Structure formats: C-alpha cells, structure tokens
C-alpha cells in the first residue's frame, strides 16, 4: 500500500468512527505533517489530500482515490475498521481513538501510526 493511501485510509477511518472532521495528520513513519482532510456524513466520506491536490471519498464501504484512480474498501467495526486496497492488492486493519490511528498494512507486514488534528 502506498504511504499516501495509508494516510487517506487513516483520515477516512477516523472521520467515520469518531464522527469528527479531520483537518490534518502527522505520519510518524515519514516524520512529517500531512495536509489531508476528511469528513463523514450519512455513511458518505468526502476528503482532500492537499499534498497530492486530489480528492477522495465515496459511500461506505467503498472509497475512491481520484489521484490513483482506484478503490479502497473501508468497513467499520466498533473502534476499528478493515478493508482492502485494490491498487496494491493488500488488506489493512485500522484501530482508531480520539487523536490516533494505528494502521496495520498486510502488504508491509507492520504497523503505521498517525496523530490526528481535528477541525
């Protein structure tokens, strides 16, 4: 899974599960702040990846990345979400709390952490 796809999933999962607008992320693996925003209303996600200048979103469980022209599934389950990135062919699981998203990328076989800035 691309690093920007992990960030997109983290922002979308947080918006879906916590119910607040995401105004940015800090990617611990990359060591940098990401310009990414996301919100969810009535099971519909809308987001913007400012670093790539592209939108993403869709009606759950399907999200579409306008930049990569690919679909990613996102299925909420309590305080976590799971899904599949069709571009990479890999699954993921995300654990979400008020200010943190931890995402396990099965393609990389490891965890990634994102601090969340709430709008």
Regions found by a protein language model. Name each.
Residues 2-119:
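Repetitive, compositionally biased segments used for assembly/scaffolding
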């Amino acid at each position: 899974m691309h690093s920007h796809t992990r960030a997109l999933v983290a922002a979308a999962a947080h918006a879906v599960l916590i119910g607040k607008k995401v105004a940015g992320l800090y990617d611990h693996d990359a060591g940098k702040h990401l310009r990414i925003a996301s919100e969810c209303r009535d099971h519909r996600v809308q987001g913007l990846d400012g670093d790539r200048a592209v939108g993403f979103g869709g009606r759950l469980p399907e999200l579409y990345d306008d930049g990569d022209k690919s679909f990613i599934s996102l299925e909420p389950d309590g305080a976590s979400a799971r899904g599949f990135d069709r571009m990479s062919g890999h699954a993921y699981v995300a654990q979400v709390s008020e200010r943190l998203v931890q995402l396990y990328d099965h393609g990389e076989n490891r965890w990634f952490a994102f601090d969340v800035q709430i709008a």
